[in-house]
Amino acid sequence: MSLNPPIFLKRSEENSSKFVETKQSQTTSIASEDPLQNLCLASQEVLQKAQQSGRSKCLKCGGSRMFYCYTCYVPVENVPIEQIPLVKLPLKIDIIKHPNETDGKSTAIHAKLLAPEFVNIYTYPCIPEYEEKDHEVALIFPGPQSISIKDISFHLQKRIQNNVRGKNDDPDKPSFKRKRTEEQEFCDLNDSKCKGTTLKKIIFIDSTWNQTNKIFTDERLQGLLQVELKTRKTCFWRHQKGKPDTFLSTIEAIYYFLVDYHTDILKEKYRGQYDNLLFFYSFMYQLIKNAKCSGDKETGKLTH
């Protein structure tokens, strides 16, 4: 659900002045016991106040929620929207949500709240058409066919080359003409297309790991380039038993993918540009961590 552009600008300008840089070293952050403690985040004072005052009303549907409405994708009444950071992303993101996924437990909503112009959420079986754009789209999901982020550009270029071959495979065209046309196409490809080839959209499945198979095996997602985050570990408080700690929550997967994409594909130094994607997540993580340490039985009520 989109918000008006003027609000985007206002949020971006106001939060730039409130930006709080706690640490600049992403490597140190990942290596530490608490991987979220060194993030460059906007002030979370608004969340602290909201947590103290308790649930508030969604101005759209009237529902009682903590921090934000997970059905309307907007902050609640006691969390002013201008105090929520706005994150600019280098890619568009589609999230395919399992219909049985509990909205209040999903972290996918965080991405929509914090980067609304770049993120779309679809509820399965609703899936966009990707077949004609498989050379610029990747599905972020582990599996035997998955590749690492650093190999994305190579594999997308191979797809473009395969598409060129397919277009020139005309049985009615003399073979020598087909060969010449193909050579010319590859020449053009090397001169222009490959240089400008970039990933434009990434897809995530939002579901418990036990329910992902239904979406993952859907024919509309078959054949897409599959990418796995193999070195990151989750700190999600709802970690599922029997699953490796490299199986991330949705917002963790989005965040870590973008950090690695920034350094491995864009070849730029990461300076916390996407850390605010964990604005809600890191706050909830700390709340629950503190509650567990104090033996608070109300831990489950701290989040939806």
Curated annotation (Swiss-Prot):
The keyword Acetylation applies. It is an enzyme of class 2 (transferase). Pfam families: DTW (PF03942). A motif (DXTW) lies at residues 206-209. Transmembrane segments: none annotated. It is found in: Nucleus. Its EC number is 2.5.1.25. It catalyses: a uridine in tRNA + S-adenosyl-L-methionine = a 3-[(3S)-3-amino-3-carboxypropyl]uridine in tRNA + S-methyl-5'-thioadenosine + H(+). It comes from the Eukaryota. The modification N-acetylserine is found at S2. Its main location: nucleus. The keyword Acetylation applies. GO terms for molecular function: tRNA-uridine aminocarboxypropyltransferase activity. Keywords: Acetylation, Nucleus, S-adenosyl-L-methionine, Transferase, tRNA processing. One of its GO terms (cellular component) is nucleus. Catalyzes the formation of 3-(3-amino-3-carboxypropyl)uridine (acp3U) at position 20 in the D-loop of several cytoplasmic tRNAs (acp3U(20)). This is tRNA-uridine aminocarboxypropyltransferase 1. It comes from Homo sapiens. The lineage of its organism: Eukaryota, Metazoa, Chordata, Craniata, Vertebrata. The gene is DTWD1.
